[in-house]
UniProtKB/Swiss-Prot annotation:
CDD domains from the UniProt entry: ATP-synt_Vo_c_ATP6C_rpt1, ATP-synt_Vo_c_ATP6C_rpt2
Taxon lineage: Eukaryota, Viridiplantae, Streptophyta, Embryophyta, Tracheophyta
Family: Belongs to the V-ATPase proteolipid subunit family.
GO cellular component: membrane; proton-transporting V-type ATPase, V0 domain; vacuolar membrane
Cited function: Proton-conducting pore forming subunit of the membrane integral V0 complex of vacuolar ATPase. V-ATPase is responsible for acidifying a variety of intracellular compartments in eukaryotic cells.
Pfam families according to UniProt: ATP-synt_C
Annotated site (Essential for proton translocation): 142
TM region(s), chain numbering: 11-33, 56-76, 96-117, 130-155
GO molecular-function term, one example from the UniProt record: proton-transporting ATPase activity, rotational mechanism
Organism of provenance: Oryza sativa subsp. japonica (Rice)
Listed name of the protein: V-type proton ATPase 16 kDa proteolipid subunit
């Protein structure tokens, strides 16, 4: 019996840390975006209640960010089964980087959506022509989270390709 530490005992920790970070950070972004743009909708709705349903778009877009984190967390957690097949440190680090890529991109997108949504719905109440511009900016902010989701899927697919030497 060798006393050399291979690191495989700690690899699932990094994998589950990646799953948790994907969900936690993306939900933090979703919560911030929902809260910030929701405050804008509520304050705008006092003066122009007929625009509330039209101005709910940033709140919905922010809520979608949590789903991206959930997708990556499920992909990662289904790939962690050290009893069925060997799970190396490479796999754990791949899953950790996957979760961080998706989670932090979701956090950044949520902050952008919240700030743009808050200012956008208030400005839309005063000048309705700004609605299309607000939607375009929100789409670009949402694309940040999509980039993180795509990179997260690519990185998590790299797990399981390592082999013991």
């Amino acid at each position: 019996m060798s006393s050399v530490f291979s690191g495989d005992e700690t690899a699932p920790f990094f994998g589950f840390l990646g799953a948790a970070s994907a969900l936690i950070f993306s939900c933090m972004g979703a919560a911030y975006g929902t809260a910030k743009s929701g405050v804008g909708v509520a304050s705008m709705g006092v003066m122009r209640p007929e625009l509330v349903m039209k101005s709910i778009v940033p709140v919905v877009m922010a809520g979608v960010l949590g789903i991206y984190g959930l997708i990556i967390a499920v992909i990662i957690s289904t790939g962690i089964n050290p009893k069925a097949k060997p799970y190396y440190l490479f796999d754990g680090y791949a899953h950790l980087s996957s979760g961080l890529a998706c989670g932090l991109a979701g956090l950044a997108a949520g902050m952008a959506i919240g700030i743009v949504g808050d200012a956008g719905v208030r400005a839309n109440a005063q000048q309705p022509k700004l609605f299309v511009g607000m939607i375009l900016i929100l789409i670009f902010a949402e694309a940040l989270a999509l980039y993180g989701l795509i990179v997260g899927i690519i990185l998590s697919s790299r797990a399981g390709q390592s082999r013991a030497d």
